[in-house]
């Protein structure tokens, strides 16, 4: 993802609307096929078809909530990456929300059944936990149980499907085999919905996203007005690309902290 995550991606896509837009999966392909230059005889990293396909078709419910799974063929490796990504950001988002005091354990116990279940298990097993230890154990259990359920259910799906090759997978009507069980998925969806309604839509998070979008927009405009602000060695080998695409490449490769630092140097 570019700096400031999905908010940054939306801004770059808007700024690049007249230049084929910006989408982070396609940008990842651009990086590994063109921008990374490790070898003298060809651009990119010379990755396998399976890896490139996984990058191109990587998706999560946050990225593409309305995407029909049957619309896109995904290798098993790509499906594993997708669910691993979801497992990670679900746990990290809960942890971030609690640490930021946007959500409380009491809120989650009251409104999210899977959180309530895990809390009861931990409290019956441990006594005298500090708040920090409790939250750590809750996130550990959330991650572990997601992994275990995904492995168990996916193994059953693969066995039932009879898939033994890429060709077999391509011929399936339902190609998504790496997934949670329906019952477990319902619990995770309840947690995700609660996060969306009470964390992602939080006023402070909204303000933070708007700040990130402002930084990216101002950087883009500044670099567009004075191309020399970009290090020459960065764009020297990309002379065939449009100025806007080079600027987009440069900004999308920044970290949050580097983008903020560049903004402060230019505008403070």
Predicted feature descriptions by range:
Residues 25-27, 31-268:
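Histidine-centered, transition-metal-coordinating active-site segments
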Residues 1-18, 22-25:
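Aspartate-rich (DDxxD/NDxxD/DxxxD) Mg2+/diphosphate-binding motifs
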């Amino acid at each position: 993802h570019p700096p400031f995550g999905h908010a940054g991606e939306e801004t770059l896509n808007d700024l690049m609307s007249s230049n084929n837009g910006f989408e982070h999966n396609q940008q990842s392909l651009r990086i590994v096929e063109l921008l990374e230059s490790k070898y003298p005889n060809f651009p990119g990293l010379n990755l396998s078809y399976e890896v490139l396909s996984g990058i191109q078709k990587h998706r999560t419910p946050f990225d593409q909530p309305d995407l029909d799974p049957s619309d896109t063929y995904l290798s098993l490796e790509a499906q594993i990456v997708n669910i691993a990504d979801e497992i990670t950001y679900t746990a990290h988002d809960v942890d971030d929300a609690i640490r930021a005091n946007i959500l409380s354990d009491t809120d989650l116990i009251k409104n999210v059944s899977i959180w309530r279940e895990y809390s009861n298990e931990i409290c019956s097993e441990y006594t005298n936990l500090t708040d920090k230890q409790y939250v750590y154990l809750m996130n550990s259990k959330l991650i572990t149980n997601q992994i275990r359920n995904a492995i168990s259910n996916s193994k059953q799906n693969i066995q039932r499907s009879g898939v033994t090759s890429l060709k077999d997978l391509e011929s399936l009507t339902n190609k998504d085999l790496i997934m949670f069980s329906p019952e477990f998925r319902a619990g995770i969806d309840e947690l995700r919905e609660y996060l969306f309604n009470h964390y992602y839509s939080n006023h402070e998070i909204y303000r933070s996203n708007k700040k990130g979008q402002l930084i990216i927009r101002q950087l883009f405009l500044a670099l567009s007005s004075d191309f020399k602000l970009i290090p020459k060695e960065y764009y020297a080998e990309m002379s065939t690309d449009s100025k806007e695409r080079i600027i987009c490449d440069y900004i999308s490769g920044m970290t949050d902290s580097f983008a903020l630092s560049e903004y402060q140097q230019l505008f403070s």
